[in-house]
């Protein structure tokens, strides 16, 4: 793009040199910079993303009369480099030195150059608009690629036609409102460096963001700058970081601007100029041996403390310029807090010293920074801010690790913090209603953006906290928030959870009674409705005139707060779960244009994300994304034996999760019933769930599984689970191949929502591909293009399963556009390592191009093209499936033909040959043509693929990873962890708390995990404390919940409170089991100073008289650990071996003998009777 600008300058440069030279004597010193910055008109779309500094008064506009300032740079007669001269110190040098012939010919090129300039500028403007609309992470799938390439070709053609023109001129923007004219005495000629950046989409802009002074990147004299080739810039740890080479640096010379200084930590605060630190120029004159040369100060990094190291060649005097490295600085790094209120004020200049030759810079190259990137780079670099010695707190954003590259986008800096009018009320509700104490990634920014009336698109993985992003704003905002959700079960679960938080919410679905619906409509029609969240289905919105009338009534009274589209991937036809009623939701934007909209999803690749925003007609939405990585999930793919898959599931469950809840996904209803029956027969509580059951039966099965009442495993089709927020699902097993990566990610993501380690297991067989292809072809809805999309999604899933080399986690994230994930994540977290990373690298890469060519020729000779099964065939052609081809290639006796490639693959194992042929299908070298037999069976026959000819022509090489052995169910040794006694008590306490919540759930008719989540219960158990003040510090525990359920919870915690309270422990006597602590040499005999052991309280001769039980084969440590002879203290206190208290031998033997037979049970004190807190009183009575 920037080369186009260079040619543009060249067209008019010669014709204007003379005129500029004549005018130079009339120019004021401050006017030079102004003329430079007044050449390019900016479109409104060029700076919609910019956050304005909100100045007190509008900046004055500048005259666009002078278009070019070529006299700023002066050709050096000695070395040919450009020299920068001050206009006050050397006014006689302002006239350019040109040869006479060049001056005479400049007028002849003026008209032609001006015409060419207009053409090139128009082309450049179009390209800029296109590039500005493309985020970097979408460049691989941009929708305007064709148009962009056409514009680039047109530009090259224009540049070729203008080869005879001189390009030694500089263009400046026309209408740039900047601070350069505030001080007419400011010395011009100081370079402003504008480095390249990335294209930034208009996502995230606001209608008011159009007042920031902007700078369009300028192209400078190509003869005045040297080239820095292949300069690799460090990647910034930001959401859309990238690596770029062959970058360019552009130096301009507006009036004096303050220079940010780099602190010792590598971060920079934009400093407001002062008398001591500001010298009227960005260039400082060094002392010593280099006193004759100017140097540019160290480049500032962004105020967000992003790390970008300097990579310019050593010794280059210009290497300190911040543009050399800060090529990724763009809107995402813009921080409004970096601007000072008085940034427009004039700066007192100093005497301009004699100007030395200008430093050398790299020329422009194709693919350079877009307009908006350079605009923000120049604006951020030129705007004064706080002094570097006193940086503003809260402005820095630490760089994230590569494992989460899509979080903390600096473009959302203006939504961070608690500086808004709603912040106080929001925090109050956040703490008191939701019982939370800290926000997760992007939650605070998304909530603030919603409360500021922005459209928001939120992409967070399951468990990332999407619901809070609209529930908390709904509680803060006036009016009703309408939430559109796809499933009734999901709606009921969300409303139920909100009611436990005392948040007014309700729902309107097709199955509620007319009386209940009338009550809801009556409430909505009130002057001040108490309902904060109204949940509806998309079908209800599209079909119910009564609901639309109620919404219009709220809209007219300005009580319609926002629309929330949950599971927004259903909107896109490119998504894995497209629904027509979702696509019709754009009617909400048309009917209620001013109502903000929020779309949320956990599964959407870049293409689907863009389609969702377009379909819903969202207005410049703020996009909040997170890493798709689910850090607590362990991914495995195992080979499937279709007739034994149910037994394989059973064995795996009994081995790894014998008592945990899980889901088994099956392809058909029949498989659900069959799998559930086999599991039940083997003693595992399993039930089937599919559309063939009645509504009442489905609800019953779901309720049993959710509450763990007679159902541990649910065997379901893929439709199950979207509406269930059960947090403690420890495993998800796919007994059949999913239809797409998106579907697999969402279905497997239903495990481990509480953050605990969970398994995602997939049984894979290529035979499932044929079944799924048939289902896709039988779909009534959709055209051939939609079917092809589904086929592509299916083969992406097959490729995931066939890949035995790359990490499973990295494959999933790469599909969603997250390509810079930490490749060592599995190695760094062995508890969730995937099967590919845990497997030894027992494969070797082999070039199999020759073998593949033989296979292609065989298929050409014996098989047909796609769609040729029922058509005319060549003589001798046949129908061969992949399995038949494998037999022929291996040279098996059962092969249908024993010629051609017969036996050529005898050196391979059958497993590798099968993988090779499947790879050829995935790589589109071969293809499969589906044929339906008379018995309604689907058979896939091998035909040539679209890339077969490329292989034959030698244009495509085939690499294959050959493994030594076929994959099988690995025999992994179950790790037996030795738990300390306190850990055992925590586990026992957690079990009792869970049972208590289940009892409370039955009484209050809510799911037990909606009372306290699994993670909250675990934190409560880990405290082993019954102190309400301690419990209130835990996320998810509020005073309202303690008032409802506190008595029962504290009653359980009282049993374990002596583990944390020494005073309580002092009142108890703990006995040990016979033969444990009392045996000689035991390592576990311990007691507190004030606790008397029953062993030491008895007769001293008791040790010699006691006999060991003859059948005792257990270890001493195990007996002791269950005996409870150690006392632990909370708050980090260490347990220690206790000395016997004086007089311990005089303890009552009666008490000792009475307790000895109890088998080392803990002594439990009576529960305390609460008196100080009213909410500790029991709230119910168990009959």
UniProtKB/Swiss-Prot annotation:
Site (3' overhang DNA-binding): 488, 579, 691, 717, 739, 881
Keyword annotations of the record: ATP-binding, DNA damage, DNA repair, DNA replication, DNA-binding, Helicase, Hydrolase, Isomerase, Metal-binding, Nucleotide-binding, Nucleus, Zinc
UniProt-annotated location(s): Nucleus
Annotated region described as Disordered, given as residue ranges: 1-109, 164-215, 260-323, 381-408, 1068-1183
GO cellular component, one term: nucleus
Biased composition (Basic residues): 1133-1142
Listed name of the protein: RecQ-like DNA helicase BLM
Organism: Gallus gallus
Gene that produces this protein: BLM
């Amino acid at each position: 793009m920037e080369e186009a600008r260079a040619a543009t300058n060249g067209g008019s440069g010669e014709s204007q040199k003379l005129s500029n030279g004549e005018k130079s004597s009339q120019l004021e010193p401050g006017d030079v910079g102004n003329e430079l910055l007044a050449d390019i008109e900016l479109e409104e779309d060029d700076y919609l993303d910019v956050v304005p500094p909100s100045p007190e008064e509008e900046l004055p506009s500048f005259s666009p009369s002078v278009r070019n300032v070529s006299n700023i740079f002066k050709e050096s007669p000695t070395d040919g480099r450009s020299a920068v001269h001050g206009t006050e110190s050397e006014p006689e040098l302002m006239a350019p030195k040109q040869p006479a012939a060049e001056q005479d010919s400049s007028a002849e090129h003026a008209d032609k150059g001006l015409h060419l300039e207009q053409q090139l500028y128009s082309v450049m403007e179009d390209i800029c608009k296109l590039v500005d609309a493309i985020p970097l992470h979408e460049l691989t799938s941009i929708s305007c690629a064709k148009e962009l390439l056409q514009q680039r070709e047109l530009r090259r053609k224009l540049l070729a036609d203008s080869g005879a023109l001189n390009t030694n001129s500089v263009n400046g923007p026309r209408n740039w409102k900047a601070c350069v004219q505030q001080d007419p005495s400011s010395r011009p000629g100081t370079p402003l460096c504008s480095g390249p950046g990335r294209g930034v989409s208009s996502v995230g802009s606001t209608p008011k963001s159009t007042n920031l002074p902007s700078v369009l990147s300028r192209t400078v004299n190509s003869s005045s700058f040297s080239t820095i080739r292949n300069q690799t810039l460090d990647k910034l740890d930001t959401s859309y970081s990238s690596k770029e080479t062959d970058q360019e640096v552009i130096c301009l010379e507006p009036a004096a601007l303050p220079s940010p200084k780099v602190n010792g930590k590598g971060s920079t605060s934009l400093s407001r100029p002062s008398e001591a630190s500001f010298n009227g120029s960005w260039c400082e004159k060094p002392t010593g041996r280099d006193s004759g040369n100017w140097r540019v100060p160290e480049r500032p990094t962004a105020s967000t403390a992003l790390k970008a190291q300097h990579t310019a060649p050593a010794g280059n005097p210009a290497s300190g310029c911040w543009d050399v490295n800060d090529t990724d600085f763009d809107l995402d790094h813009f921080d409004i807090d970096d601007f000072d209120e008085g940034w427009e004020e004039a700066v007192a200049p100093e005497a301009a010293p004699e100007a030395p030759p200008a430093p050398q810079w790299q020329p422009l190259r194709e693919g350079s920074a877009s307009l908006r990137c350079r605009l923000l780079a120049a604006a951020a670099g030129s705007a004064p801010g706080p002094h570097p010695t006193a940086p503003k707190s809260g402005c820095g954003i630490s760089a994230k690790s590569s494992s989460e590259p899509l979080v903390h986008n600096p473009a959302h800096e203006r939504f961070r913090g608690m500086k808004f009018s709603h912040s106080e009320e929001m925090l109050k509700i956040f703490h008191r209603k939701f019982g939370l104490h800290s926000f997760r990634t992007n939650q605070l920014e998304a909530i603030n953006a919603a409360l500021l009336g922005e459209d928001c698109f939120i992409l967070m993985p399951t468990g990332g906290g999407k619901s809070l992003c609209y529930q908390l704003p709904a509680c803060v905002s006036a009016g009703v928030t309408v939430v559109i959700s796809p499933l009734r079960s999901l709606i009921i679960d969300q409303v139920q959870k909100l009611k436990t938080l005392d948040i007014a919410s309700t729902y309107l679905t097709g199955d509620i009674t007319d009386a209940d619906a009338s009550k809801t409509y009556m409430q909505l029609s009130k002057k001040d409705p108490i309902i904060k969240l109204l949940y509806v289905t998309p079908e209800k919105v599209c079909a119910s005139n009564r609901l639309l009338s109620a919404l219009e009534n709220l809209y007219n009274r300005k009580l319609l707060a926002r629309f929330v589209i949950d599971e927004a991937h259903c909107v896109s036809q490119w998504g894995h779960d497209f629904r027509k009623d979702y696509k019709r939701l754009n009617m909400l934007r048309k009917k209620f244009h001013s109502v903000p909209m929020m779309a949320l999803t956990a599964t959407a690749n870049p293409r689907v994300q863009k389609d969702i925003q377009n379909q819903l007609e969202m207005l410049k939405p703020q996009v909040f994304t997170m890493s798709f990585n689910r850090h607590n999930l362990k991914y495995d793919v195992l080979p499937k034996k279709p007739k034994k898959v149910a037994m394989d599931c059973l064995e795996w469950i009994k081995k790894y999760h014998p008592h945990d809840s899980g889901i088994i996904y099956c392809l058909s209803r029949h498989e659900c019933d069959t799998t559930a029956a086999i599991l039940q027969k083997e003693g595992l509580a399993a039930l089937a769930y599919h559309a063939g059951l009645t509504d009442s039966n489905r609800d019953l099965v779901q309720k049993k599984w959710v509450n763990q009442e007679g159902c541990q495993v649910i065997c379901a089709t893929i439709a199950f689970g979207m509406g269930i927020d059960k947090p403690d699902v420890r495993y998800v097993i796919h007994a059949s191949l999913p239809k797409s990566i998106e579907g697999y990610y969402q279905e497997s993501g239903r495990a481990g929502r509480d953050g605990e380690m969970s398994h995602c297991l997939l049984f894979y067989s290529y035979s499932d591909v044929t079944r799924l292809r048939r289902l896709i072809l039988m779909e009534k809805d959709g055209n051939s293009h939609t079917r092809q999309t589904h086929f592509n999604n299916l083969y992406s899933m097959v490729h995931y399963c066939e890949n035995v080399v790359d990490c499973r986690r990295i494959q999933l994230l790469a599909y969603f556009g997250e390509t810079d994930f930490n490749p060592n994540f599995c190695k760094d977290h062995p508890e969730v390592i995937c099967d590919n990373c845990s497997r030894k690298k027992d494969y070797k890469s082999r070039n199999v191009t020759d073998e593949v060519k033989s296979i292609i020729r065989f298929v050409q000779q014996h098989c047909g093209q796609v769609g040729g099964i029922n058509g005319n065939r060549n003589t001798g052609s046949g129908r061969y499936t992949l399995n038949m081809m494998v037999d022929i290639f291996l040279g098996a006796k059962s092969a249908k033909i024993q010629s051609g490639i017969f036996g050529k693959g005898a050196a391979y194992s059958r497993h590798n040959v099968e993988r090779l042929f499947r790879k050829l299908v995935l790589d589109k070298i071969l293809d499969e043509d589906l044929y339906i037999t008379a018995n309604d069976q689907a058979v896939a026959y091998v035909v040539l693929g679209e890339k077969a000819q490329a292989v034959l022509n030698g244009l495509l090489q085939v690499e294959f990873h050959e493994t030594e052995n076929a994959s099988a169910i690995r025999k992994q040794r179950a790790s037996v962890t030795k738990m300390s006694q306190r850990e055992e008590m925590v586990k026992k306490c957690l079990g009792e708390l869970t049972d208590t919540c289940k009892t409370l759930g039955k009484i209050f008719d809510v799911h037990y995990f909606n009372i306290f989540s699994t993670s909250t219960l675990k934190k409560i158990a880990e405290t082993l404390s019954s102190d309400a003040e301690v419990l209130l510090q835990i996320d998810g525990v509020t005073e309202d919940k303690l008032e409802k359920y506190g008595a029962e919870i504290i009653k359980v915690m009282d049993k374990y409170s002596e583990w944390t309270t020494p005073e309580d422990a002092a009142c108890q006597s703990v006995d040990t089991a016979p033969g444990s602590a009392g045996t000689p040499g035991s390592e576990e005999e311990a007691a507190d100073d004030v606790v008397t052991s029953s062993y030491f309280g008895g007769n001293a001769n008791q040790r010699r008289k006691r006999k060991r039980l003859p059948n005792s084969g257990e270890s001493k440590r195990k007996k002791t650990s269950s005996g409870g002879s150690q006392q632990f203290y909370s708050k980090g206190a260490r347990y220690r071996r206790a000395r016997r208290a004086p007089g311990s031998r005089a303890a009552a033997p009666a008490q000792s003998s009475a307790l000895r037979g109890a088998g080392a049970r803990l002594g439990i004190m009576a529960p305390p009777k609460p008196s100080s807190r009213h909410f500790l009183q029991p709230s119910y009575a168990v009959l």
